[in-house]
UniProtKB/Swiss-Prot annotation:
It comes from Cucumis sativus. It is a multi-pass membrane protein. Belongs to the complex I subunit 2 family. The lineage of its organism: Eukaryota, Viridiplantae, Streptophyta, Embryophyta, Tracheophyta. Pfam families: Ndh2_N, Proton_antipo_M. NDH is composed of at least 16 different subunits, 5 of which are encoded in the nucleus. This is NAD(P)H-quinone oxidoreductase subunit 2 A, chloroplastic. It is an enzyme of class 7 (translocase). NCBIfam families: NDH_I_N (TIGR01770), PRK02504.1 (NF002701). The gene is ndhB1. Keywords: Chloroplast, Membrane, NAD, NADP, Plastid, Plastoquinone, Quinone, Thylakoid, Translocase, Transmembrane, Transmembrane helix, Transport. It catalyses: a plastoquinone + NADH + (n+1) H(+)(in) = a plastoquinol + NAD(+) + n H(+)(out); a plastoquinone + NADPH + (n+1) H(+)(in) = a plastoquinol + NADP(+) + n H(+)(out).
């Protein structure tokens, strides 16, 4: 009899939970329509994989790319709508969040064609790769719109789990296994640190989890200047630092870049930074509103260390992927300047603009590395010597992307950095901007060193890898060329296009 009553109570509770979830999805589902498109694409991929004996590979790529493009279209149609909070305060929809979601979707859309030839040559499992990419994209999008501590913790974990699986995708590669182990261990440690910081924030605010309610809770409990908030700030900064990978939280980055499959590195190098930047701006700007001086100081230290260490260590690297790893550490230092400035002097707009250009510059560079690596089997910088004599298009496009990363005019990277540094200068960050300018000059040195190797014309300096260089017979080569062309064009946008981009970015502020 007791078991019968308990069973009935369980059924009633389960039904009540199901009806509540259905009610939320029915009335709030429109607010996550772009995410729902990706979920539908994931279901289609699973259905095709489980029902088809012979995998229809073109359909898998088509479904993945189409779901990403449709999700971008849904975001654009929703542009300029009024900010809304849905799912009982767990999710917020506004222009600021949506532009970061757009950047993540753009990264994934460009990374899929970039990966086609690599997957075919290495015979990687296609369906699982696409599933992990789409799921990581979904986690990044939910992180951008997260409005409470639980969602801010769960969403990046979804992204991180897929990242661990992608980094170790080539199971027979010892370097890939080592990279995955380091990535997993440090990722788990950083998540523990992050949730510990959240617990201090939760307790200090009187048990609130929504970002704005935390501010109100801190006012009610008079804990906004307490030591508990300082402890929470330190732990949360360390936890988010792992996702952004500034110095000194950068130890995992070079090993993961070097050991992971190159298309995976291309994907992680941009999406993780975009998602973490979106989360950092909201966490620091809202719950830690009363501790702005403290978190400004912490981020300034991280930015200075990142710009100096990242660019100086990059000079000594012999692996192209490790060089780009340290370069990305320096680049995130520039992005942090925009986070510190905030929306008072156009900091967020300049940060968003620079990240848009960084996506194009970085993915364009990785597209060329994927293409060169598949034809030569090497990642050593010296093995690029004389590439211009064999493949002028690849050499010139790689040179343009590297010059844009270095910030040489009239390329997009120059105008992105110029606007970012100008906003920092107007905000009074003179020392930080000066460090940024000096380290940018350092970065130009090691980028030009690679370009000099590319353009070497003397036979005695051309390596055997380039001498035996062969173009790919695969038709999928067209897809990587498409990604490369799009990225190169975006990397070489002249300054005349800066004003409309800045104006659009300004509309994304809170």
């Amino acid at each position: 009899m007791i078991w019968h009553v308990q069973n009935e109570n369980f059924i009633l509770d389960s039904t009540r939970i199901f009806m509540k979830a259905f009610h939320l999805l029915l009335f709030d589902g429109s607010f996550i329509f772009p995410e729902c498109i990706l979920i539908f694409g994931l279901i289609l991929l699973l259905m095709i994989d489980s029902t088809s004996d012979q995998k229809d590979i073109p359909w898998l790529y088509f479904i993945s790319s189409t779901s990403l493009v449709m999700s971008i279209t849904a975001l654009l149609f929703r542009w300029r709508e009024e900010p809304m909070i849905s799912f009982s305060g767990n999710f917020q929809t506004n222009n600021f969040n949506e532009i970061f979601q757009f950047l993540i979707l753009l990264c994934s859309t460009l990374c899929i064609p970039l990966s086609v030839e690599y997957i075919e040559c290495t015979e990687m499992a296609i369906t699982e790769f696409l599933l992990f990419v789409l799921t990581a994209t979904l986690g990044g999008m939910f992180l951008c719109g997260a409005n409470d501590l639980i969602t801010i913790f769960v969403a990046p974990e979804c992204f991180s789990l897929c990242s661990y699986l992608l980094s170790g995708y080539t199971k027979k590669d010892v370097r890939s296994n080592e990279a995955t182990t380091k990535y997993l261990l440090m990722g788990g440690a950083s998540s523990s640190i992050l949730v510990h910081g959240f617990s201090w924030l939760y307790g200090s605010s009187g048990g609130e989890i929504e970002l704005q309610e935390i501010v109100n809770g801190l006012l009610n409990t008079q804990m906004y200047n307490s030591p508990g908030i300082s402890i929470a700030l330190i732990f949360i900064t360390v936890g988010i630092g792992f996702k952004l990978s500034p110095a000194p939280s950068h130890q995992w980055t070079p090993d993961v870049y070097e050991g992971s499959p190159t298309p995976v590195v291309a994907f992680l190098s941009v999406t993780s930074k975009v998602a973490a930047s979106a989360s950092a701006t909201r966490i620091f700007d809202i719950p830690f509103y009363f501790s702005s001086n403290e978190w400004h100081l912490l981020l300034e230290i991280l930015a200075i260390l990142s710009m100096i260490l990242g660019n100086l260590i990059a000079i000594t690297q012999t692996s192209m992927k490790r060089m780009l790893a340290y370069s990305s550490i320096g680049q995130i230092g520039y992005v942090i300047i925009g986070i510190i400035v905030g929306d008072s002097n156009g900091g967020y707009a300049s940060m968003i603009t620079y990240m848009l250009f960084y996506i194009a510059m970085n993915l364009g560079t990785f597209a060329r590395i994927v293409s060169f690596g598949l034809r030569t089997g090497t990642d050593n910088i010296r093995d690029y010597a004389g590439l211009y004599t064999k493949d002028p298009l690849l050499a010139l496009s790689l040179a343009l992307c590297l010059l844009s990363l270095g910030g040489l005019p009239p390329l997009a990277g120059f105008f992105g950095k110029l606007h970012l540094f100008w906003c920092g200068w107007q905000a009074g960050l003179y020392f930080l901007v000066s460090i940024g300018l000096l380290t940018s000059v350092v970065s130009i040195y090691y980028y030009l060193k690679i370009i000099k190797l590319l353009m070497t014309g003397r036979n005695q300096e051309i390596t055997p890898h380039v001498r035996n260089y062969r173009r790919s017979p695969l038709r999928s080569n067209n897809s990587i060329e498409l990604s490369m062309i799009v990225c190169v064009i975006a990397s070489t946008i002249p300054g005349i296009s800066m004003n409309p981009i800045i104006e659009i970015a300004q509309d994304t502020l809170f």
